[in-house]
Amino acid sequence: MPSKLEGAMDALITVFHNYSGSEGDKYKLSKGELKELLNAELTDFLMSQKDPMLVEKIMNDLDSNKDNEVDFNEFVVLVAALTVACNDFFQEQQKKRSK
């Protein structure tokens, strides 16, 4: 049985490949595929944002090689950044509760 971390890694890989390749390179996400992934897999995150250009900004920030596609490495950077932001938020909430 895989560990929780191994399960999380498997989930990242599976989610990425469930959305990549329908519009071109099967190992990369196009802008449309990224938008579909974000809407389906990060619904709560997107609903809490007020910026209608958020997906465009995320794409521009992630697309480090400027090929208008997001590869798996670039995708993992997004997930890591969001995870850090969530962790920071929860730490702040914990600090407020303990005061």
Curated annotation (Swiss-Prot):
Keywords: Calcium, Metal-binding, Repeat. It comes from the Eukaryota. In larva at 5 days post-fertilization, shows very restricted expression only in a few large cells of the olfactory placode. More widely expressed in the adult. Expressed at higher levels in gut than in spleen, head kidney and gill. It holds the Pfam family S_100. One of its GO terms (molecular function) is calcium ion binding. Residues 13-48, 50-85 form the EF-hand domain. Ca(2+) 1 binds at S20, E23, D25, K28, E33. Induction: Induced by poly(I:C) in gut but not in spleen. Induced following infection with spring viremia of carp virus (SVCV). Down-regulated following infection with bacterial pathogen Edwardsiella tarda. Ca(2+) 2 binds at D63, N65, D67, E69, E74. Homodimer. Homodimers may assemble into larger stable oligomers. PANTHER family: PROTEIN S100-A1-RELATED, S100 CALCIUM-BINDING PROTEIN. This is Protein S100-Z. The gene is s100z.
